[in-house]
């Protein structure tokens, strides 16, 4: 008889204090005009993304839908700086358009997030539709 071992999945929200997660989601909802449940999903994915990037030491790009989580956390600068320094020993800078957000990039990022044990909300990791010429996002309207 085979034994099935349930491995619990990690959640990004568990990387910060519950009170901070609430403040971040409330801000994200208000700043981006989102319903609370969507802001929670975005912040959860964003924190998992940041942990993946921090642990890898490599620059990664979030999806267009997850990017507001990074912006939200960075705007809470004291908490963000302390979190980065305590967890990774460095501040993680945000360089917009540091990497194209095409399908292959998002598959790479979500694969890395999953490899660390996080459950990925695939609906938030689509391809960005807004492109900055001359870059092409792969399947956006500018291509």
Where does each model-flagged region fall?
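Intrinsically disordered, low-complexity, repeat-rich regions
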Residues: 1-143
């Amino acid at each position: 008889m085979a034994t099935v071992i349930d491995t619990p999945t990690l959640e990004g929200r568990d990387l910060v204090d519950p009170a901070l997660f609430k403040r971040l989601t409330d801000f994200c909802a208000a700043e981006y005009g989102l319903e609370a449940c969507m802001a929670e999903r975005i912040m959860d994915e964003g924190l998992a993304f940041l942990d993946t990037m921090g642990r890898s030491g490599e620059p990664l790009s979030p999806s267009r839908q997850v990017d507001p989580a990074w912006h939200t956390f960075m705007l809470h600068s004291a908490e963000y700086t302390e979190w980065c320094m305590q967890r990774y020993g460095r501040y993680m800078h945000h360089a917009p358009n540091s990497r194209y957000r095409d399908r292959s990039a998002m598959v790479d990022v979500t694969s890395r997030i999953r490899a660390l044990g996080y459950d990925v909300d695939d609906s938030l990791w689509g391809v960005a539709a807004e492109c900055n010429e001359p870059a092409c996002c792969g399947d956006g309207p500018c291509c």
